[in-house]
Amino acid sequence: MNIHEYQGKEILNSFGVRIQRGTVARNAKEAVEAAKELTEKTGTGWHVIKAQVHAGGRGKGGGVKLAKNLKEVEEIAGEIIGMNLVTPQTSAEGKKVHQVLVTEDVYYPGDNEPEEYYMSVLLNRATGRNMIMYSTEGGMDIETVAEETPELIFTEEIDPATGLLGFQARRIAFNLGLSGKGFKEMTKFVMSLYEAFEKSDSSLFEINPVLKTSDDLIMAVDAKVTLDDNALFRHKDYAEMRDVREENATEVEAREVGLNYVDLDGNVGCMVNGAGLAMATMDLIKQAGGEPANFLDVGGTADAKRVEEAFRLILKDDKVEAILVNIFGGIVRCDRVAQGIVDASKNMGDAMNVPIIVRLQGTNADIAKELIDNSGLKVSSAIQFQEAADKVQEVLSK
């Protein structure tokens, strides 16, 4: 589950990670009030107005701007709130901004020049261990750094038996070229950051940039946090941070009815039971010359009602030109799935106007085939995997 920057910073702050202070505002008036309060605390009249959407690259899209007085705060907040922000990580339509984060300006003058770093904590799936990835090239797209100057990216893997050890945090600070107060501050920052990552059951922390201020304080200026959905039962307060306005509407609807659905950009809808079979089915669609329009796992308890709900979700996508139903009946009874297909056709009528290829194998597959054959539906049946692929290819070539 993705959350907003300000929510991620709240989590970081609760574990002792120093953050760039700020207040959320939902209109220009609230933004001005937030700026006034920050001025009282910091003594500076400069503020940064940051659009709160679930997407990176906000600055490139005009979603992060500096305001040097209250008038500019009001103007910029009014301009950003309500806009459709287009970034390299959004669709062409962009995402509507409902709120902004009004923050303090932390690039103040002092004895030293401020310096930016990149740091993230994530699971290295190749080794099965958490890993801290960091670089001196903060404030930039880490993908660009990895491609052009990979030698500037460092990694530190953490043994799950011991957790992050002090010498590892010190090594990170050393590799970033820090010394004196900055070295001690970075060591403390890294230890607190990793504690926050573990105890919040997150799958990703990305801080870009981590800032060393002119007086050698280390703080998180930005925060991209992804929480593990499967652990939200342990964090009721985090679960309340979900902003469904930022999520795909069909995915939200699927979650509410207990289906695992991920929206994709292709033209062939797929309905499968089991994540492994779903992945194989998506490969099958690719080999047949199509592109998967979705990942949809109806689960091990698929019945007629769930199958009908699945069809409704798939057909919400106007790009879908065909649907492949690929079910292996172990616990799932194929006849129930077949009944769901028949019921969906009756209840949805003309909405089910795309070709449907059905492969039902396993428990009660013979009964399922009889149900579909006697239904009068224009459904293509397949027994073998390759046969299903051929029928998808045939449909797409028409």
Curated annotation (Swiss-Prot):
<feature type="binding site">
    <location>
        <position position="116"/>
    </location>
    <ligand>
        <name>ATP</name>
    </ligand>
</feature>
<protein>
    <recommendedName>
        <fullName>Succinate--CoA ligase [ADP-forming] subunit beta</fullName>
        <ecNumber>6.2.1.5</ecNumber>
    </recommendedName>
</protein>
<dbReference type="InterPro" id="IPR013815">
    <property type="entry name" value="ATP_grasp_subdomain_1"/>
</dbReference>
<comment type="function">
    <text>Succinyl-CoA synthetase functions in the citric acid cycle (TCA), coupling the hydrolysis of succinyl-CoA to the synthesis of either ATP or GTP and thus represents the only step of substrate-level phosphorylation in the TCA. The beta subunit provides nucleotide specificity of the enzyme and binds the substrate succinate, while the binding sites for coenzyme A and phosphate are found in the alpha subunit.</text>
</comment>
<feature type="binding site">
    <location>
        <position position="222"/>
    </location>
    <ligand>
        <name>Mg(2+)</name>
    </ligand>
</feature>
<feature type="binding site">
    <location>
        <position position="273"/>
    </location>
    <ligand>
        <name>substrate</name>
    </ligand>
</feature>
<keyword id="KW-0547">Nucleotide-binding</keyword>
<comment type="pathway">
    <text>Carbohydrate metabolism; tricarboxylic acid cycle; succinate from succinyl-CoA (ligase route): step 1/1.</text>
</comment>
<keyword id="KW-0436">Ligase</keyword>
<dbReference type="GO" id="GO:0000287">
    <property type="term" value="F:magnesium ion binding"/>
</dbReference>
<comment type="subunit">
    <text>Heterotetramer of two alpha and two beta subunits.</text>
</comment>
<dbReference type="Pfam" id="PF08442">
    <property type="entry name" value="ATP-grasp_2"/>
</dbReference>
<dbReference type="InterPro" id="IPR013650">
    <property type="entry name" value="ATP-grasp_succ-CoA_synth-type"/>
</dbReference>
<feature type="binding site">
    <location>
        <position position="106"/>
    </location>
    <ligand>
        <name>ATP</name>
    </ligand>
</feature>
<dbReference type="InterPro" id="IPR016102">
    <property type="entry name" value="Succinyl-CoA_synth-like"/>
</dbReference>
<dbReference type="InterPro" id="IPR005811">
    <property type="entry name" value="SUCC_ACL_C"/>
</dbReference>
<comment type="similarity">
    <text>Belongs to the succinate/malate CoA ligase beta subunit family.</text>
</comment>
<dbReference type="InterPro" id="IPR005809">
    <property type="entry name" value="Succ_CoA_ligase-like_bsu"/>
</dbReference>
<dbReference type="GO" id="GO:0004776">
    <property type="term" value="F:succinate-CoA ligase (GDP-forming) activity"/>
</dbReference>
<keyword id="KW-0479">Metal-binding</keyword>
<dbReference type="GO" id="GO:0005524">
    <property type="term" value="F:ATP binding"/>
</dbReference>
<keyword id="KW-0816">Tricarboxylic acid cycle</keyword>
<dbReference type="InterPro" id="IPR017866">
    <property type="entry name" value="Succ-CoA_synthase_bsu_CS"/>
</dbReference>
<dbReference type="GO" id="GO:0004775">
    <property type="term" value="F:succinate-CoA ligase (ADP-forming) activity"/>
</dbReference>
<dbReference type="GO" id="GO:0006099">
    <property type="term" value="P:tricarboxylic acid cycle"/>
</dbReference>
<feature type="binding site">
    <location>
        <position position="50"/>
    </location>
    <ligand>
        <name>ATP</name>
    </ligand>
</feature>
<dbReference type="Pfam" id="PF00549">
    <property type="entry name" value="Ligase_CoA"/>
</dbReference>
<feature type="domain" description="ATP-grasp">
    <location>
        <begin position="9"/>
        <end position="253"/>
    </location>
</feature>
<feature type="binding site">
    <location>
        <begin position="57"/>
        <end position="59"/>
    </location>
    <ligand>
        <name>ATP</name>
    </ligand>
</feature>
<dbReference type="GO" id="GO:0042709">
    <property type="term" value="C:succinate-CoA ligase complex"/>
</dbReference>
<keyword id="KW-0460">Magnesium</keyword>
<dbReference type="GO" id="GO:0005829">
    <property type="term" value="C:cytosol"/>
</dbReference>
<dbReference type="GO" id="GO:0006104">
    <property type="term" value="P:succinyl-CoA metabolic process"/>
</dbReference>
<feature type="binding site">
    <location>
        <position position="208"/>
    </location>
    <ligand>
        <name>Mg(2+)</name>
    </ligand>
</feature>
<feature type="binding site">
    <location>
        <begin position="330"/>
        <end position="332"/>
    </location>
    <ligand>
        <name>substrate</name>
    </ligand>
</feature>
<keyword id="KW-0067">ATP-binding</keyword>
